[in-house]
Design a protein with these regions (language model features):
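Multi-pass membrane proteins that catalyze or facilitate reactions on polyprenyl-/lipid-phosphate substrates
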Residues: 1-202
Length: 202
């Protein structure tokens, strides 16, 4: 994500203004805040209570249906130049649902952006950009946990996984953005419904 959007991220960092309400960098920080707070407060609860097949089935099914519903409701009027603090906070609040096993971070943030009136392309782009600070927090948290649990961390394995993820992301993001812009989110919603059925059967 960082590599693909490197030019966008350079501009975001360069133009970061904490006093300009439509500033994209500020709005990405605002959108990250809810999951940072919720993740810190609920991590142990989620680990102990929500990692079950039933939870994964229902979240997979529900967010698939909501993705189709929000795609059909989308009015495609706003772009990222019109992003507001209110919208960012709402999108970030939706992102908290990504903490529930079976949900998708990108799906819930795209759903929120669509319901707020953003174009399909900009909903997807904001979701991808939001992944940068969000996944940085997740990676940092996991790294801290690993360092506390064991001194035998395989940095080779971490590097290998990161490299595979990097190559996969580069090959997929461009295709996904073009696909979403032309087709929308319905195929992804249908995929989640079929996946929920697979989970239920097996």
């Amino acid at each position: 994500v960082i590599f693909y959007f490197r030019e966008d991220l350079k501009e975001i960092i360069k133009n970061l203004n904490l006093f300009e309400k439509n500033n994209l960098g500020l709005n990405l920080l605002i959108a990250t805040a809810p999951i940072a707070i919720a993740g810190f407060m609920s991590k142990d609860f989620i680990e102990m209570n929500l990692r079950s097949e039933d939870v994964i089935f229902w979240t997979t099914l529900i967010f698939g249906l909501v993705l189709i519903f929000s795609n059909n409701l989308s009015i495609d009027q706003k772009n990222l130049n019109q992003i507001s603090l209110r919208d960012s906070l709402l999108i970030g609040s939706f992102q908290v649902f990504a903490l529930i096993p079976g949900s998708s971070r990108s799906a819930v943030t795209m759903i929120a952006a669509l319901l707020l009136g953003y174009t399909k392309y900009d909903a997807a782009k904001f979701s991808f950009l939001l992944a940068v600070p969000t996944l940085f927090l997740v990676f940092t948290s996991e790294l801290v946990d690993l360092s506390q649990e064991s001194t035998n961390i395989s940095y080779f394995n971490l590097t290998y996984v990161a490299s595979i993820s990097f190559l996969s992301a580069i090959s997929c993001i461009h295709i996904l953005l073009k696909f979403i812009e032309k087709i929308g989110f319905v195929p992804f919603g249908i995929y989640r419904i079929f996946l929920a059925g697979f989970i239920l059967i097996f």
